[in-house]
Amino acid sequence: MARGFQGVMLRGLGARDHQATVVDKEYIAPHFVRVRLVSPTLFDEVIVEPTSWLRFWFPDPDGSDTEFQRAYTITESDPETGRFAVDMVLHEPAGPASTWARTVEPGATIAVMSMGSRGFSVPEDPEDRPVGYLLIGDSASTPAINGIIEVVPHDIPIELYLEQHHDDDVLIPLAEHPRLRVHRVSRDDASSLAAALELRDWSNWYCWAGPEAGALKQVRTRLRDEFGFPKREVYAQAYWTEGRAMGSSRGETSTPAKPAAKTAPAKAAAKPAAASGAGTPEHAAAPAAATTGAPQAAPAPGAAQPRTPVRGRWRAEAGSRLLAPLKKPLIVSGVLQALITLIELAPFVLLVELARLLLGGAEAERLWTLGLTAVSLIGLGAVLAAAMTLWLHRVDARFAHELRGRLLTKLSRLPLGWFTRRGSASTKQLVQDDTLALHYLITHAIPDAVAAVVAPVAVLVYLFVADWRVALVLFIPVLVYLVLMSVMTIQSGSKIAQAPRWAERMGGEAGAFLEGQPVIRIFGGAAASRFRRRLDDYIDFLVSWQRPFVGKKTLMDLVTRPATFLWIILVAGVPLVVTGRMDPVNLLPFLLLGTTFGARLLGIGYGLSGIQTGMLAARRIQTVLDEPELVVRDRTGQAGTDHASGDQARPGTVELDRVSFEYRPGVPVIRDVTLTLRPGTVTALVGPSGSGKSTLAALVARFHDVTQGAIRVDGRDIRTLTADELYRRVGFVLQDAQLVHGSVAENIALAEPDAGLERIRTAARDAQIHDRITRMPDGYDSVLGAGSALSGGERQRVTIARAILADTPVLVLDEATAFADPESEYLVQQAINRLTRDRTVLVIAHRLHTITHADQIVVLDDGRIVEVGTHDELLAAGGRYRGLWDSGRYSSPDAGRPVSADAVEVGR
């Protein structure tokens, strides 16, 4: 079978045929068929991800030897058995793919390739995920869209715009997602789909678009010009072209396909019949309708919409906004570096001229003049480079001083929940590593990148002036290098995207393995084996990826070595010199500068990598600077905020009034909670993991601001209290005891820095930790920190002493015995009983045994209060709490060991 030029190109790039046999086919809709196939070799090189696709070579319906390439998304896959399936739209008039799909029978075979497929993935770090996904397509791209919908987390909204070309398009099923909205758009012309996009703020959304080519062009223009989508936040690829039956064809007489056909599916497409109705039918048959209600239809292109589009802001552009004040200095530094690079190259040119004069027997005076000029240029280049570096360091010092001030001010105003969500390592990277990366970007990256680009270009121009024939030959190893790199990139496929995910996953596995060594060595044979298996899997991944490239990488290294360029120069130049067509002196610039030409070109990539690293750091810093702060509201005009009578005015009263909270817009984790904590009482929060216990308690301490409703302490909305005012009223003891680097006394007195030693000792005695402190080498002056020698229970008692000294009327307590060692659990419970005496306590209960004497037990489920009462009342009611109690298994995933028989319950 003939496949034409593109078939040859694909084979040259390393693509290989896999024979696939048809197993069966199933009509999903009258014009939409699923073909199931099996191939014994396909999954040896294919890694299936959402939107992954395969190239099929379809026979010519007219019976010629020509084969036609089409690409289709993988909708089902089983690598173990080699089975897979693709969904195909049956177009009229039918092209090669549609004809094959209509007539194929089980047992038929077809050639399949996997070259060029690009999978879709959701960032693993929640901080890097978009606010939502905007999906745009039609029946041809629906299989890929379904793959995306299936992997998008359920807390992320999806807006789906589907262009309707046929009445039966509504019968094609869509994947389910709780936050999916479907907009059906009738096609009047190529602009219909773009015109239907909602006028709204699309800030930090990601767009995946795969409609017909004409519609895609209009969509991309509107996304860019009206909504401000940055290029990197849009994946756009036409899945077919209206009016072109073949899309892209290959054969002995066919025209080569467009390059785009190599990188994304181009479905075979004659113009489908347009939908007859003028309206926009709703997708009644989609599974999503069962979970989201009737999907929202898009407005018709002519429907009234707001006239002014809203240009969004994306995290991808945050780095540019942060560096905007440095735009002029960075441009000036680039121009200066270009000039300095030319000055530094000039002595080499003069050296060549000096050699010419020496060979020509020139006078000594001319030689001295030329030599002194070269030396002067070397000195001038060094002085200018030093002056520019000094100036850039001054610019960086001023910018870094101002930026660190802004960053520290911002960190002091961020909610505490921001820090608990990110962790100390991420914050350290922000303050230390990212600011250091910015230093390199400002002072070195731009000059390095400019020098890396200007130097080889200037050398190339000079060599072409010296002799264009030899200069042209120097491109041979460069082209070999680029071709090999392209082949490796294409053959790597989805493994390029998988590599950083593997590295991140193994970093986490290695950290957990090292941290858990004491337990793993004693009990953890399975854990150690699991880590070794993961490590073996990672090594297998790297070997399977890199082993086929050993020969290519060796050749790439050889063709870019100076010795290779020297041989090429000699092979090309010597015959020209021997035959008298080239002056021997003209070989000198090639011998001086041409041998390093390859290294100079490769330096461009290294120079640009510094800019990329710096821009990523700038993006992370600006993203933090854009985070919403905890704002202290003005009490004036805050209706319903303050109360001046009754229990609500008594110290220690906490009221939650119709409180709701969302980490992500539209995904509530606390739902309409109303609750009162009376002064001097203990309220326990219980419920299954993920019910919202910790989140609700964190809201009382204002780790986050409520989305709706209000929380009042002593009758005042906590949003009207400064941090100092709030934390004089509300204290908290976390399950993970936090100590700072400092003395024992300093750790206990964090909330009261002016407290005398006697008060500190009294608090320590009440917390049952005084005797342990006195046994330490320096007593209360002993230095503690994250790696102190105190046991878990002893560290918890230090934090309890801190809370006792703070003496807040309200206390949020994350059950502190969950990690206590057996020797200290009783002491921790005694300390808690002293701490909770005569205070309003909200305790997050991980074990029901510890809160049986609480004044009020609140049972949460899915962010809602489902039961409230005392232990006896809730047992008698026979509801959710009774079920938890009877099961005897209630505990959080981190609850630790069973409670000891001597444990003292909170509230007793």
UniProtKB/Swiss-Prot annotation:
SUPFAM superfamilies the UniProt entry points to: ABC transporter transmembrane region (SSF90123), P-loop containing nucleoside triphosphate hydrolases (SSF52540), Riboflavin synthase domain-like (SSF63380)
InterPro entries: AAA+_ATPase (IPR003593), ABC1_TM_dom (IPR011527), ABC1_TM_sf (IPR036640), ABC_transporter-like_ATP-bd (IPR003439), ABC_transporter-like_CS (IPR017871), FAD-bd_9_SIP (IPR013113), FAD-bd_FR_type (IPR017927), FNR_nucleotide-bd (IPR039261)
Keywords annotated in UniProt: ATP-binding, Cell inner membrane, Cell membrane, FAD, Flavoprotein, Membrane, Nucleotide-binding, Translocase, Transmembrane, Transmembrane helix, Transport
Biased composition (Low complexity): 253-309
Keyword field contains Transmembrane helix: yes
UniProt: ATP binding residues: G687, P688, S689, G690, S691, G692, K693, S694
Keyword Transmembrane helix among record annotations: yes
Region annotation Disordered: where it falls in the sequence: 245-311
Domain ABC transmembrane type-1 residues, every copy: 331-613
Assembly notes: Forms a heterodimer with IrtB.
Protein name per UniProt: Mycobactin import ATP-binding/permease protein IrtA
Organism field: Mycolicibacterium thermoresistibile (strain ATCC 19527 / DSM 44167 / CIP 105390 / JCM 6362 / NCTC 10409 / 316)
